[in-house]
Design a protein with these regions (language model features):
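Hydrophobic transmembrane-helix bundles of small-molecule transporters
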Residues: 97, 119-172
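Membrane-interface helix termini in secondary transporters
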Residues: 25-26, 30, 116
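Helix-breaking motifs and short loop linkers at transmembrane-helix boundaries and internal kinks
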Residues: 32, 53-59, 121-122
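Cytoplasmic helix-loop-helix junction between adjacent transmembrane helices
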Residues: 65-101
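C-terminal ends and interior cores of transmembrane alpha-helices
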Residues: 42-55
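Juxtamembrane helix-start motifs in multi-pass secondary transporters
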Residues: 33-39
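Extracellular/periplasmic helix-loop-helix junction of adjacent transmembrane segments
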Residues: 1-20, 57-62, 95
Length: 172
């Protein structure tokens, strides 16, 4: 793989994630946050599974972009679900604090675990970790998370979503 391809393996996730984040959050508010979370988990899990079997750098880049779409649905839906489920202000603040701490810890621990997996197995293993976790998360979501959506059913601003996504991608 070229140096540029290796950089895109890293950047494809972030660029697509950033570009899709606002639209994914809006879709979750309109059509259901639990539904958006499950869709995000499925897309992320399938992208990760496919990345684990990638045979070319271009295929891996595409899989990382798919994972970015999934992540863009997961992040806003989880935060919105917390806000809906925890109605007490103190409990909500604590839940959001835990959510942020777990996300921060994952960002710090992920590369360490990934490095250990690569050192002792194969690079493919860093992507094979996610699908079993995704299955557990989907089961837990159906068992524990109530469906919620914005009761005002806001109109989806397609042009605004496209322009903001393009702008964010260009900025990133």
């Amino acid at each position: 793989a070229t140096t540029a391809q290796l950089q895109w393996v890293v950047d494809a996730y972030s660029v697509v994630f950033a570009g899709a984040l606002l639209l994914a959050g809006s879709l979750g508010d309109r059509f259901g946050r639990r539904r958006a979370l499950v869709i995000g988990l499925v897309v992320f899990g399938l992208g990760s599974l496919a990345a684990g079997f990638a045979t070319t750098a271009d295929m891996l880049i595409l899989c990382r972009a798919v994972m970015g779409i999934g992540g863009a649905f997961i992040m806003p839906s989880t935060l919105s679900i917390l806000v809906q489920v925890f109605t007490d202000r103190q409990a909500r603040a604590q839940a959001i604090g835990i959510w942020a701490a777990v996300a921060g810890a994952a960002i710090a621990i992920g590369p360490i675990v990934g490095g250990l997996l690569i050192e002792h197995t194969t690079w493919h293993a860093i992507f094979w970790v996610n699908p079993p976790l995704v299955v557990i998360a989907i089961i837990a979501t159906f068992a524990l998370v109530p469906e919620s959506r914005d009761p005002s059913k806001p109109r989806l601003d397609v042009m605004g979503a496209v322009l903001s996504s393009v702008g964010i991608i260009a900025f990133v």
